[in-house]
Regions:
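N-terminal auxiliary segments of SAM/dcSAM-dependent transferases
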Residues: 1-19, 24, 29-30
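A generic structural signal for ordered alpha-helices
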Residues: 23-27, 35, 122
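A short glycine/serine-rich beta->alpha loop
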Residues: 30-35, 56-57
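S-adenosylmethionine/decaboxylated-SAM
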Residues: 39-158
Length: 158
C-alpha cells in the first residue's frame, strides 16, 4: 500500500458490517469480484450523495449492490435510488443485502437493459452513477441527455 492509499484508509470511517459481508460474498460467489465498488469508492459515493442531496438517483450497473447501498446511506429520507442490472443472476444477492439494510427501502432494483428501463421509470434524476457495460457508455449518455429522441433523464446541472 502506497502512502496516499494508507492516508485514505487511515482517514476513512470503518466499513459497515453488512458491506463487509457483501464484499466477502462477492469475492466468494462471482467470477469478477474486482467489479465491486469496495469500501473507499463506496464512502466517496456516499459523500457525493450527501453533498448533492438528490431526491432521485439512477445507478446503471448494480453488480452485487455495494455502490447502491453506499449511496442509499447518504440519501435524505424520502429520496430514492433506482439501480439497474442487466445480469439477472445477480438479482438475488443484491436484493438480499438491500432487504437487510436499514437503507434498503430507498433502493429499487430493476433487472434488464438500462437503455430500456431508465426511460420507462419516468421523470428526471438528480444524480446518475454509471458503472455498467463500458461499451454502452456513449448510448447511456445519449439516453440521459435526450439525444435519442426522448426526454432528457437528467436536469440541468445534474
Amino acid at each position: 500500500m502506497d502512502a496516499l492509499e494508507q492516508y485514505i484508509h487511515d482517514h476513512t470511517e470503518p466499513e459497515e458490517e453488512l458491506l463487509h459481508e457483501l464484499d466477502r460474498e462477492t469475492n466468494l460467489r462471482t467470477v469478477a469480484p474486482r467489479m465491486l465498488s469496495g469500501h473507499i469508492q463506496g464512502r466517496l459515493l456516499e459523500m457525493f450523495v450527501r453533498m448533492v442531496r438528490p431526491r432521485r438517483v439512477l445507478e446503471i450497473g448494480t453488480f452485487t449492490g455495494y455502490s447502491a447501498l453506499s449511496m442509499a446511506a447518504g440519501l435524505d429520507n424520502g429520496a430514492e435510488l433506482h439501480t439497474v442490472e442487466v445480469d439477472d443472476e445477480l438479482e438475488e444477492v443484491a436484493q438480499s443485502y438491500f432487504d437487510r439494510s436499514p437503507y434498503g427501502g430507498r433502493i429499487r432494483l430493476h433487472i434488464g437493459s438500462a437503455l430500456d428501463i431508465a426511460p420507462a421509470l419516468g421523470g428526471r434524476f438528480d444524480l446518475v452513477f454509471i458503472d455498467g457495460d463500458k461499451r454502452e457508455y456513449p448510448d447511456y449518455y445519449r439516453m440521459l441527455m435526450g439525444d435519442r429522441g426522448t426526454e432528457p433523464l437528467v436536469g440541468s446541472g445534474s
